[in-house]
Amino acid sequence: MFSHFLHVFSSVPQKRIKKVFYKIKYSELMFFIYVCVKKQMNYTTYLFDFDYTLADSSRGIVTCFRNVLNRHGYTRPTDNDIKRTIGKTLEESFSILSGVTDTRQLAEFKKEYIKEADTHMTVNTVLFLETKSVLAALKDSGARIGIISTKFRYRIKELLDQHFPEDFLDIIVGGEDVQTPKPSPEGLLLAIRQLHATKAETLYIGDSTVDAETAQKAGVDFAGITHGMTTAEELKKYPHKKIMS
């Protein structure tokens, strides 16, 4: 289960890992042993995508899209069709799923989706089993951690506030914080600036080709995770340090 993040943690200082190791459940022993023997790297800042990287919100996303699409007579898209749009903007996703290109209609779909999400999203979103331990270990190691997502920041915080202390993450950049969404590097570069980090010491972790392209455009290293609908083969087409399955 924890193999997804093995490569990411290869840069955590070994002495600090030993200090936090005893806070982690025994089932993660092999994970941390692997980390301790890995070659040291120079990352101090770890920025994550959210959906399909740290959390599985697919049930909530499918429910919200389905309710809006059905309301307007678009019943053909399957659940997998909807899941394949995760990581894109709402306007892009609705255009793909409905064929609609009119910006006013897409804006109305988005408005309806947000209203649906107020009811269905957070309650239908779960963190991946390793997420808490991975973020806690990084935090305890002294690394800077954050999230870069097309999802609204307040929506991400709704879930994280149930699991972490306030301001546990150093930064969350959501869809409302940027002018141009991923794969524009705007959000990623914004986080790097605000954290007073450098590109060379930053690793971006995500599950989609949108994330891979974002890292490439920002000029930062990328690690891919196949938690979602994107295959390892698709991710490998982009510069990467590691693709984890």
Question: What do these predicted regions represent?
Answer:
Residues V8, I17-F48:
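Non-catalytic pre-domain segments flanking phosphatase-related domains
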Residues T45, K182-A212:
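Conserved Lys-Pro-Asp/Glu-containing loop-to-beta segment of HAD-superfamily phosphomonoesterases
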Residues N70-H72, S93-V100, N124, K132, ...:
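Substrate-recognition/cap helix-loop segment adjacent to the acidic, metal-dependent catalytic center
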Residues T85, T89, V126-E130, K151, ...:
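Short beta->alpha linker loops
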